[in-house]
Curated annotation (Swiss-Prot):
GO terms for biological process: immune response; positive regulation of cell population proliferation. Activated T-cells, mast cells, natural killer cells. This is Interleukin-3. Granulocyte/macrophage colony-stimulating factors are cytokines that act in hematopoiesis by controlling the production, differentiation, and function of 2 related white cell populations of the blood, the granulocytes and the monocytes-macrophages. This CSF induces granulocytes, macrophages, mast cells, stem cells, erythroid cells, eosinophils and megakaryocytes. Keywords: Cytokine, Glycoprotein, Growth factor, Secreted, Signal. The keyword Secreted applies. The gene is IL3.
Length: 146
């Protein structure tokens, strides 16, 4: 093998192992995000009442806003810590999403969860997890092909 073809092979291997420098978080195969979402929802169904009512369009827009993904996660984590404790399974599972969500500076306020209202928390978290699922499926997958 010539030194030129060895060099090409080394460059190829290096490019496959180098971290992406696109400002996007890396998605790691070690954490099964769909399973985490299912665990969160299963736990919520056991400990929270079925949500009453529905989200208004403003709440849906806030939860779907990609620049608010981290800020909304923080709101859910704060509620989970205050309600279930920092070592709760829900809190630990929510924390797993921090490294894969964009850290854009929000231009709006994050979602407001009514104090001590588990139904409100559950209803908004269900919508938020659907947003994260879509983000992980489409946006990160598209970024990885760039």
């Amino acid at each position: 093998m010539s030194s030129l073809s060895i060099l090409h092979l080394l460059l190829l291997l290096l490019s496959l192992h180098a971290p992406q420098a696109q400002g996007l978080p890396l998605r790691t195969p070690r954490t099964p995000y769909s399973s985490l979402m299912e665990e969160i929802m299963d736990d919520l169904k056991k400990i929270t009442p079925s949500p009453e009512g529905s989200l208004n369009s403003d709440e849906k827009n806030i939860l779907a806003n990609k620049s608010l993904l981290q800020a909304n996660l923080k709101a859910f984590m704060t509620f989970a810590t205050d309600t279930f404790g920092s070592d709760s399974k829900i809190m630990k599972n929510l924390k797993e999403f921090q490294p894969v969500l964009p850290t854009a500076t929000p231009t709006e306020d994050s979602i407001l969860i009514e104090d001590s209202n588990l139904g409100d928390f559950r209803m908004k978290l269900e919508e938020y997890l659907a947003t994260i699922r879509g983000y992980l499926r489409h946006d990160l997958a598209a970024a990885e092909t760039i």
